[in-house]
Amino acid sequence: MTTTMKTFVAFVLTVFFIMSSAHCRTTTGGSPGYGIGGRTKTCFTPALCIYRGVHGCDSYCKTKNFDYGYCRQEHCCCVNY
């Protein structure tokens, strides 16, 4: 009985340790850039550039909290500084 209880407690503590280390990882994506990292570009495949042109792509990107958008072939690319 004690071996099973010790194994169970060790298992629970191991799971808690793994979960806490997985949730506590820091990311650099939300840190302020101050122009050091340059700009980030994300391209989407909706047909905005085909049907609505550059203006449609730009307004789509601004609703997604990007700085601006431009068309590259049929893709709409959004840019953040």
From Swiss-Prot:
This protein's source sits in the domain of life called Eukaryota
List all disulphide bridges recorded for this chain: 43-78, 49-71, 57-76, 61-77
Q: Write out the entry's keywords from A to Z.
A: Antimicrobial, Disulfide bond, Fungicide, Plant defense, Secreted, Signal
* Keyword Secreted belongs to the record: yes
Q: What GO cellular-component annotations does this UniProt entry give?
A: extracellular region
The record's principal subcellular location, in a coarse class, is secreted
Q: Where is the protein found, in the record's own terms?
A: Secreted
Is Endoplasmic reticulum found in the keyword set?
no
Q: Which range is the signal sequence, renumbered to this chain?
A: 1-24
One Gene Ontology BP term is: killing of cells of another organism
- What family is it from? Belongs to the DEFL family.
Designated name of the protein: Putative defensin-like protein 102
